[in-house]
Design a protein with these regions (language model features):
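Extended, hydrophobic alpha-helical segments in both membrane/secreted and soluble proteins
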Residues: 70, 118, 186-192, 196, ...
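An active-site-proximal structural segment forming one wall of the substrate-binding cleft
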Residues: 66
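Surface-exposed loop/interface segments of Gram-negative outer-membrane beta-barrel transport/assembly proteins
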Residues: 1-51, 71-187
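Outer-membrane beta-barrel channels and translocator barrels
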Residues: 61-63, 127-129, 197
Length: 202
């Protein structure tokens, strides 16, 4: 609204920009707060992400007709999230006197993921005149581990004490939440083929 005043005479952002009171006198009306005021506060809204990935492969002819191919890859990821709003933030303007000490909030989250994939295939090929033997033996191994947690706290009367440990309590009726799960996969393969004169297969 271009007609709403959002700064005082000194050029500072004001906290409350407008108040609506019904003409009929019914209801309590509504107060509108200035979101620009929050820019003057010490707030935190950060997300960080680290990712390390590596791939390795080998292709080795051990002897004529015998060949080994293998690969290995892994990924390690870390995520960090932090969100802090002090007690004077407009999000808490309508808190009742009973919840006065709950004003201010900090949400911290952490996550970690580690996964790897390893595989190898040994191939054998032999031929004599019209006789051909072909064999393959291989395996595959995968694992994925994920851990994550979130902590929601409240009660930050001093905006300069902006670390989660300065909270007065966990979120009302809340508790730290997290999850951890692991998945694994193992596979094997093998085959043996014989052919004669490129017409008869076994």
């Amino acid at each position: 609204n271009p007609y709403v005043r959002y700064k005082d005479d000194d050029g500072n952002y004001i906290y409350e920009v407008d108040r609506y009171i019904p003409i009929s006198g019914g209801g309590l009306g509504q107060t509108f707060y200035n979101p620009l005021y929050n820019t003057t506060l010490n707030t935190i809204d950060e997300e960080k992400y680290n990712d390390v990935t590596n791939n390795f492969g080998v292709d080795w002819t051990i002897i004529e007709g015998l060949r080994l191919k293998g690969s290995f890859s892994f990924t390690h990821q870390n995520t960090y999230g932090d969100n802090f709003k002090p007690a004077r933030h407009t999000d808490f303007a309508d808190y009742s006197d009973e919840d006065f000490d709950r004003r201010g909030a900090y949400i911290g989250s952490r996550g970690e993921n580690f996964s790897y994939d390893a595989s190898a295939v040994l191939t054998y090929f032999w031929q004599l005149d019209k006789h051909v033997v072909n064999a393959n033996l291989g395996w595959n191994l995968q694992e994925n581990v994920t851990r994550e947690f979130t902590v929601k706290t409240e009660g930050f009367p001093n905006e300069n004490l902006d670390y989660i440990s300065f909270a007065t309590q966990y979120e009302k009726e809340g508790a730290p939440a997290g999850d951890e799960y692991t998945s694994r996969l193992v596979g094997f393969l093998g085959n043996l083929n014989y052919s004669y004169d490129e017409r008869y297969l076994l």
